[in-house]
């Protein structure tokens, strides 16, 4: 039964998106997991907790005996069947537990008895996690070009189209503003960092990478924060600023935040509940900056938002949203971004419209 246990092996697993059957308890998996991992636990949360208490009170032999007692009979067979199905579906995958200890070895042995030989990660999730952290530290040392610009400048799309671009907002499942949440919940901090490391490793492995192209982000992207090693390098990076006409930005924002989000919510929840979720999403975003807008201005814009939603519901038109979006950009988002950009003006090396910045980036 083959085992993977070298640094290069760990990196190769992440680069190849190797399917990982993670047999840790769900609570451990939620706290941090690798990108291509699926959670098929040997023990559920309650079983793991009981075994842990037994280990502290009576030692390892008693804990092991309790574990075998809890995962026996029909429960054991159901879990073997689930692992077996996952192995057959992912013939080039690998088993993983916390440290490559008893849990993954037990599952490996039970699978062997069921006719399947399947490798495991020697060192487990902990070893993969350390590999991810170290890879990010190393890869962050390459030069970085940041793509800046006001809200609606198409920065994310520009980054996505570069072979050396890494979409930080996509990995974080958040677009970085008060209206930035998506229908996908954000991952734990550790899982986000693991996703980032894997993406950087894959991007670096598939080309002769000289520099990174990233969006000019703040430290926080929703509830996730950038690893300090990368954030520190980004503060030293050069910046290319997209300066598109205001009307073009409005078109992008209409497409992204009104048309697409409405479509996504109704696709996920159905027409009626999807509409309610969409309305709540927009109101929540505006409410998040109530204090900065001031109560009077917030109430004015919230009333315009309600009117725009009524128009959209009855006619399908999103044009009414301009009545609150335009002042929100002119009075809040644009001044805020310009103020932030002024503080790092010496790092700006290029300005232009979207296509011009894209061409400039390709030439670097």
UniProtKB/Swiss-Prot annotation:
It is an enzyme of class 2 (transferase). Residues 14-137 form the Rhodanese domain. Keywords: Selenium, Transferase. InterPro entries: Rhodanese-like_dom (IPR001763), Rhodanese-like_dom_sf (IPR036873), SelU (IPR017582). The keyword Transferase applies. Involved in the post-transcriptional modification of the uridine at the wobble position (U34) of tRNA(Lys), tRNA(Glu) and tRNA(Gln). Catalyzes the conversion of 2-thiouridine (S2U-RNA) to 2-selenouridine (Se2U-RNA). Acts in a two-step process involving geranylation of 2-thiouridine (S2U) to S-geranyl-2-thiouridine (geS2U) and subsequent selenation of the latter derivative to 2-selenouridine (Se2U) in the tRNA chain. Belongs to the SelU family. This is tRNA 2-selenouridine synthase. The lineage of its organism: Bacteria, Pseudomonadati, Pseudomonadota, Gammaproteobacteria, Enterobacterales.
């Amino acid at each position: 039964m083959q085992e993977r246990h070298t640094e290069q092996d760990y990196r190769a697993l992440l680069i190849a998106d190797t399917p990982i059957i993670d047999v840790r308890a769900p609570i451990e998996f939620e706290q941090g997991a690798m990108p291509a991992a699926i959670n098929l636990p040997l023990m559920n949360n309650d079983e793991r907790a009981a075994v842990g208490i037994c280990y502290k009170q009576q030692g390892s032999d008693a804990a092991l005996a309790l574990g075998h007692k809890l995962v026996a009979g029909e429960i054991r067979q159901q879990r073997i069947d689930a692992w077996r199905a996952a192995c057959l579906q992912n013939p080039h995958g690998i088993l993983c537990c916390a440290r490559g200890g008893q849990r993954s070895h037990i599952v490996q042995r039970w699978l062997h008895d069921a006719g399947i030989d399947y490798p495991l990660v020697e060192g487990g999730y902990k070893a993969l996690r350390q590999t991810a952290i170290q890879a990010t530290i190393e890869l962050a040392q390459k030069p970085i070009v940041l793509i800046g610009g006001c809200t609606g400048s198409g920065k994310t799309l520009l980054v996505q189209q570069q072979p050396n671009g890494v979409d930080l907002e996509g990995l974080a499942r958040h677009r970085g503003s008060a209206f930035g949440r998506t229908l996908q919940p954000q991952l734990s901090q550790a899982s986000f960092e693991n996703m980032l490391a894997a993406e950087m490793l894959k991007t670096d492995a598939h080309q002769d990478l000289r520099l990174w192209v990233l969006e000019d982000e703040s430290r926080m992207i929703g509830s996730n924060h950038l690893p300090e090693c990368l954030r520190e390098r980004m503060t030293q990076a050069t910046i290319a600023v997209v300066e598109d006409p205001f009307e073009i930005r409005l078109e992008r924002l209409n497409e992204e935040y009104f048309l697409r989000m409405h479509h996504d919510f109704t696709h996920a929840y159905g027409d009626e509940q999807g509409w309610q979720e969409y309305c709540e999403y927009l109101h929540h975003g505006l409410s998040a900056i109530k204090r900065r807008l001031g109560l009077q201005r917030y109430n004015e814009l919230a009333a315009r938002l309600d009117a725009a939603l009524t128009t959209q519901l009855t006619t399908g038109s999103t044009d009414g949203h301009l009545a609150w979006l335009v002042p929100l950009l002119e009075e809040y988002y644009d001044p805020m971004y310009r103020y932030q950009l002024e503080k790092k003006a010496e790092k700006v090396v290029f300005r232009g419209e979207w296509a011009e910045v894209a061409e400039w980036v390709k030439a670097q």
